[in-house]
Amino acid sequence: MEGFGEFESRPSKDKIKILKGTTTVGLVVKDAVILAADRRASAGFFVANKMVRKIVYIDDRIGMTTAGSVADLQFIYNYMKNIYHYNLISGNRPVTVKSLATYLTNILSQNKYFPYLVQILMGGYDTQPRLFNLDYLGDMTEETYVATGSGSPVAMGVLEDGYSPDLTGDQAMDLAARAVMSAIKRDSFTGTGVIVTKITKEGHVEREIYPNRKEAM
């Protein structure tokens, strides 16, 4: 059609590559959701920041891992926090992990032709532990364990070998951290250390692990 010769209905391959420079992990066990992510931010082959936080919290029992464009992620995070607190103030139905993930996937799908360049794991505990994987086109899948990003092939192998739904929360934290640490050893876009969090009905507990210095609590 005349006038639309330069229009691209899908994002370019160069833009899609932005999503791949990290490693994030999520898994569900009996009484908890575990999220883990490395701390390196890369711009191409340049290490832009060594101490980036890639796990954020919508509330004490709902968290997200973040990968992709920093500006888009900041917008999505602030937007979802506002939606969550608006629903609490309004006194509507309880805000569940699935309802938040569904709301976000609708936002991403509506903007698929000019997408937010993000890859998100959303996990939390409402009546039970839940974990959802969302991509920039608005696809959403519920997972029991998952790894995303450039280091995901390495991390997924560790999860496949060690995952069981009967793991305790602390055992699952160790497994998630080990999966990301394995990716750090083999993937140049994953680095510095790991933040790992355990989310239960009581709230979340977080640990930081670094290969070359003492673990920080």
UniProtKB/Swiss-Prot annotation:
NCBIfam families: arc_protsome_B
Membrane-spanning residues: none
Reaction equations catalysed: Cleavage of peptide bonds with very broad specificity
UniProt cross-references to InterPro entries, sorted A to Z: Ntn_hydrolases_N, Pept_T1A_Psome_bsu_arc, Pept_T1A_subB, Proteasome_bsu_CS, Proteasome_sua/b, Proteasome_suB-type
Enzyme class: hydrolase
Active site: T22
GO molecular function: threonine-type endopeptidase activity
Protein task: Component of the proteasome core, a large protease complex with broad specificity involved in protein degradation.
Activity-regulation annotation: The formation of the proteasomal ATPase PAN-20S proteasome complex, via the docking of the C-termini of PAN into the intersubunit pockets in the alpha-rings, triggers opening of the gate for substrate entry. Interconversion between the open-gate and close-gate conformations leads to a dynamic regulation of the 20S proteasome proteolysis activity.
Keywords on record: Autocatalytic cleavage, Cytoplasm, Hydrolase, Protease, Proteasome, Threonine protease, Zymogen
Record GO cellular component, one term: proteasome core complex, beta-subunit complex
Propiece residues: 1-21
Gene Ontology BP annotations: proteasomal protein catabolic process
Record-given protein name: Proteasome subunit beta 1
Principal location listed in the UniProt entry: cytoplasm
Record SUPFAM superfamilies: N-terminal nucleophile aminohydrolases (Ntn hydrolases)
Similarity annotation: Belongs to the peptidase T1B family.
Keyword Cytoplasm: yes
Native species: Metallosphaera sedula (strain ATCC 51363 / DSM 5348 / JCM 9185 / NBRC 15509 / TH2)
Quaternary organization: The 20S proteasome core is composed of 14 alpha and 14 beta subunits that assemble into four stacked heptameric rings, resulting in a barrel-shaped structure. The two inner rings, each composed of seven catalytic beta subunits, are sandwiched by two outer rings, each composed of seven alpha subunits. The catalytic chamber with the active sites is on the inside of the barrel. Has a gated structure, the ends of the cylinder being occluded by the N-termini of the alpha-subunits. Is capped at one or both ends by the proteasome regulatory ATPase, PAN.
Compartment annotation: Cytoplasm
EC number: 3.4.25.1
